Amino acid sequence: MPFTCPLPCPHQGQIRELPHHGTRVSDGARTADPLRTKMKRKGLLAVTAAAALSLVASLVTTTSASAAVNCDPYAGYKSMKGKTVTIFTSILEPELTTLNTAMADFQACTGIKIKIEGSNQFEALLPVRVKGNNAPDLAWIPQPGLLAKLVETGKVKVAPKAVVANVDKYWSKSWKAYGTVKGKFYAAPFGSNMKSLVWYSPKQFKAAGYTVPTTWDQMTALADKMAADGKTAFCGGLGSGGATGWPATDWVEQVVLRDHGSAVYNGWVNHTIKFSDPRIVASMQKVASWMQNPKWVGNVKGIATTTFQDAGKDIPGGKGCMMLQQASFYGNIIAESGATISPTGDAFAFYLPATNSKVTVPVVGGGEFTAAFSSRPEVQAVQAYLSSATFATSRVQLDNWISANSGVPLAAYKNQVDKLAATYLANPKSTFGFDASDLMPAAVGAGSMWREFTAWFGEGKSIADVTKAIDASWPKN
């Protein structure tokens, strides 16, 4: 039975490495299978056409506060009994029910009924609905590129002042930038996921006397020590069916952001900075010295044929490699063997260290953004609520969800991996980079990059030839 990535999987907006909503893991996104959001370009959920058209969320109908509900957190919102706000999303069950539960008190205290409709055809249907004047009041958009295209229609509303205030207070500038189009802020961040983690076994580290590295130099020194001890320091797997190659795109993204920061990273995403640019080439060379180092990984070419699921499955027992760079969802794969996931257990993760002191807390990940197609008072009230620390905390407390909202206390997280991810995602000093290959044209981010990076590992193709081929594949218009 294929692994299903619980709801927070890494790559959102496309179909690639992880799933997108429906089951969750520890990544803040929502997907239902690891080949779905690198996530969304890579693998659609298996549903019938009829089911695709009827994937509608459950509806909360509570419209009046009861004695059991504490309405103090919602005192700033006006009573709007009888009003309904619709939300369209790619998030599916069971996450939809959990979201409704998280919003129940808000609905009870304000009288606003929130109706959420989820569809695995979201990205195809939303533009059609907007063009046909049948847009929802709100939409959770997992792709900044899709947001930009919708803004071009003139139908997306600029975020109201209350939302702007919340985002300025609770999110880093990097996060706000992804909800901004041509200088105007439209969409507040919603859920999030993190990919900048390294999986390892606390028990195996303790037995061998190893310490978790906190700098890149410490990590490479540790890898040398492991190699000297006869161990395989790092492992990796690019295999993912029709999406084979995506893990290598993640490795390059991690290093480009760490080496050069947001300006170069975003220029690379837009192709104003080419793959053949010396800065991108230098980062790829660093990836090669890390993940193509025979002393650390053993059989380099074998990485191209190993599946991403199998790459680190033996980490808990110390029989395979000692470390694997993967997103937070990977804990669910390891846990399938019965391994305990905790800071002192069979497996856990640490933050992939920075490479450049001038780039503070670099984090690669993804997430959704709340865009509005109506400016009715009740819609703006829901917008403000969804961008608040009150909502984010309510959802986090129900488990298996990550928010980059810094107003959420870390104590609210039940899942230790989610808490670890939130520590970095919600850091106000973080330099956040939305998964680059998910933002690039599909012909590149879910096409030539996968193919060329697989050839880079599996065939020993040179960086010069790889970058030349990817640049040549970039759409002309």
Protein language model features and the residues they cover:
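C-terminal capping/gating helix-and-loop segments adjacent to ligand/active sites or protein-protein/ligand interfaces
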Residues: T180, W401-V408, K419-P475
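Short, solvent-exposed loop/beta-turn-alpha elements that line the ligand-binding surface or hinge
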Residues: G76-S79, P160-W171, L238-G242, R258-A282, ...
